[in-house]
Swiss-Prot record:
Domain of life: Eukaryota
Modified residues (5-glutamyl polyglutamate): E438
UniProt keyword Metal-binding present: yes
SMART domains linked to this entry: Tubulin, Tubulin_C
Gene name linked to the record: tubb2
Protein name: Tubulin beta-2 chain
Compartments reported by the entry: Cytoplasm, Cytoskeleton
Amino acid sequence: MREIVHLQAGQCGNQIGAKFWEVISDEHGIDPTGSYHGDSDLQLERINVYYNEATGNKFVPRAILVDLEPGTMDSVRSGPFGQIFRPDNFVFGQSGAGNNWAKGHYTEGAELVDSVLDVVRKESESCDCLQGFQLTHSLGGGTGSGMGTLLISKIREEYPDRIMNTFSVMPSPKVSDTVVEPYNATLSVHQLVENTDETYCIDNEALYDICFRTLKLTTPTYGDLNHLVSATMSGVTTCLRFPGQLNADLRKLAVNMVPFPRLHFFMPGFAPLTSRGSQQYRALTVPELTQQMFDSKNMMAACDPRHGRYLTVAAIFRGRMSMKEVDEQMLNVQNKSSSYFVEWIPNNVKTAVCDIPPRGLKMSATFIGNSTAIQELFKRISEQFTAMFRRKAFLHWYTGEGMDEMEFTEAESNMNDLVSEYQQYQDATADEQGEFEEEEDEA
């Protein structure tokens, strides 16, 4: 089997990671003790991707939980599925990173990283044929962003030919924990551009807007935001966990989705959007699902896809539905809004259907888009970064941990390069040959 080793780092990473394991354990019929109580062979057919089968028919998640302070991991351990994880896979420090990327990446995190890598090796060795790693973390804090990116680069060194996939929560001024989020996020993106194969950009701003506008929650909590994240994560991993043809492993997904190695930041979406209480009231049709899924209000990244163009798209439909109808609707979207898909990648929309719907829904759709509009998210962080960096505000916290201002400048320019690369491919057309000839004539 093709296994995936899951890592979760920092407070946010551990909270959404724990939620992810709750949701997929439920979908695979696994209870909090690791015993199987399912009703379908499909649940077990590819269970090995995320779970290790231990003695006594117990299923143990291939998960490694990392943090620089014990708090969040204690609450995961005492949470609903806390006992399902392998106790040795909790790796934590005592000092905390204090929302400081440098502490996570260079000082505190660097001290803990070797003991994490030991656990990574142990998990990898129990795999038959490891396909890659996935990390859940946020980019605004200290541990998830600083130590998370340190782990990525260390794992990359040791397993250079395995896929590295991240679920990265982007900071937002609307749901802000700390004032230095733009610094931490920029330093992290600088690492993610170079060291990951696919990154799902989950944006607190978008999650907040969905809760507020669509779900009519007046004061969304992190619990509400994480409910959306876990639905999305369950959706994008469907193809990896259940039998199917399309994007059945991380590498195939990357091959379909990433036309240029640096442009691997995906915009996830989900339909139907429901709040935690109101799922069962009406079933959606395939046309409604498709329409909702492409709607900017359903995107988990605060970018408007209509401001850019799609390089590639993958859609995953779940539930009992007619393949024919799904294909018709997807073609319909591409024909109606063809200007939003780059014409120099033909057939750049791929669709998969899985029979098993998520808990509480008859059918759902998950959207993964590689859109040039994602640059809006990086621009937003970059502007906040520049505003503070110009005045060197809060910089002493980072230089005090041994960082150099030069590193900030490099991260800033790498992020700006990323934005202009997206812009370049947004403007590119299939008949560029003609434009160059015209320029020569003028010369």
